[in-house]
Amino acid sequence: MKRMKLRTNAGPLQGTIQVPGDKSISHRAVILGAVAKGETRVKGLLKGEDVLSTIQAFRNLGVRIEEKDDQLVIEGQGFQGLTAPCQTLNMGNSGTSMRLIAGLLAGQPFSVKMIGDESLSKRPMDRIVYPLKQMGVEISGETDRQFPPLQLQGNRNLQPITYTLPISSAQVKSAILLAALQAKGTTQVVEKEITRNHTEEMIQQFGGRLIVDGKRITLVGPQQLTAQEITVPGDISSAAFWLVAGLIIPGSELLLKNVGVNPTRTGILEVVEKMGAQIVYEDMNKKEQVTSIRVVYSRLKGTIISGGLIPRLIDELPIIALLATQAQGTTCIKDAQELRVKETDRIQVVTDTLNSMGANIKATADGMIIKGPTVLYGANTSTYGDHRIGMMTAIAALLVKQGQVHLDKEEAIMTSYPTFFKDLERLCHD
């Protein structure tokens, strides 16, 4: 088996980085642009494999999408402009694509089959199947957990529902709201904890109307959307890897440019500041929710991460776990059982990977207990097909002074950050 040899024993990281476009916003720009009336132009779109799966799905649904002058141009014909696909819709590794597009297709008068890769086929879809069934959609997957492939028969006469989310999930909320845009009457979604709100913000940006009152979102349908020009900010989930690298590698100083700082996504910034991180925000644009972040090596202390903070940093928890291995004292992550049904069981995989390198982490049912600081050593590792595990391991390897770190299945990183290793080499000044 050929494994990638990762860079180890790095000196201080120096330089400026522009992280790729935000994955969540990129997906939603394509999805809403595909059903808005008119020509939507998207700048700064992430060209990772997940977003490409969303683009291909809409091409298969009859939407004209092409690249012009570094922009993605989407010729939307409204909700009535989608046509039955001639083939199965393949969502690759993308849970966002499958869940949100299932919600959107709920109101269409045709049937589709949606499949995914091996990893996506192990992710439960019951969380969207049940609310969509209540709205009048025929939808089913495999076993009680409704694993992909999904078979869906849309319904032009969707029923509005009031639905209390049993879990904190922006994807489930989004699937219901996308269906609700096509249902006649008032749909309400009540969240357990407030999750990322890109769908709500972007529905409004495309001319849709909804009311957000704390954890309750109300949308009266049906509605039509109007094409927009969208600029996608840098992805804070991708920036998180450089943020942590800058904090834990002695002598480092990095400037992360144009990072999206939507308040439902900035949990990691609050956590690292509480742990003692030295970070400075430059060129903050509160209206556009973007900033540049200057980060320098810092001495950190352990902390507790739980409750309403978890949905605001769920994707950053693997790299936060690495950060905690270098902090003084104990860090406890709780209420994060959702990590077990991501691209991998991230609680177990993070624990096993970092412990194999010398960390002191105990996995719990809903999180991890991490004792630091610990010295990290070489090991044979894998992404397990999970992009965030791969990038976490590559940053961990930079700290290794003894031994080599080899990484299997590194191609998974293409999902969200195709230029990750190129950027890493640029910041490593030998």
From Swiss-Prot:
The catalytic residues are 315 (proton acceptor)
Q: Where does phosphoenolpyruvate bind?
A: 23, 95, 123, 171, 346, 388
Positions binding 3-phosphoshikimate in this chain are 23-24, 28, 169, 171, 315, 342
Among Pfam families, the record links this protein to: EPSP_synthase
Question: Chief subcellular site?
Answer: cytoplasm
Q: Which InterPro entries match?
A: Enolpyruvate_Tfrase_dom (IPR001986), Enolpyruvate_Tfrase_sf (IPR036968), EPSP_synthase (IPR006264), EPSP_synthase_CS (IPR023193), RNA3'P_cycl/enolpyr_Trfase_a/b (IPR013792)
Pathways involved: Metabolic intermediate biosynthesis; chorismate biosynthesis; chorismate from D-erythrose 4-phosphate and phosphoenolpyruvate: step 6/7
Output the superkingdom of the source species: Bacteria
Q: Which GO terms describe its molecular function?
A: 3-phosphoshikimate 1-carboxyvinyltransferase activity
User: What UniProt keywords are attached to this protein's entry?
Assistant: Amino-acid biosynthesis, Aromatic amino acid biosynthesis, Cytoplasm, Transferase
The protein's annotated catalytic reaction(s) are: 3-phosphoshikimate + phosphoenolpyruvate = 5-O-(1-carboxyvinyl)-3-phosphoshikimate + phosphate
EC nos? 2.5.1.19
* GO aspect biological process, one term: aromatic amino acid family biosynthetic process
GO CC annotations, alphabetized = cytoplasm
Q: Where in the cell is it found?
A: Cytoplasm
Query: What family is it from?
Result: Belongs to the EPSP synthase family.
Quaternary structure, per UniProt, is: Monomer.
What the protein does comes down to: Catalyzes the transfer of the enolpyruvyl moiety of phosphoenolpyruvate (PEP) to the 5-hydroxyl of shikimate-3-phosphate (S3P) to produce enolpyruvyl shikimate-3-phosphate and inorganic phosphate.
Question: What's the protein here called?
Answer: 3-phosphoshikimate 1-carboxyvinyltransferase
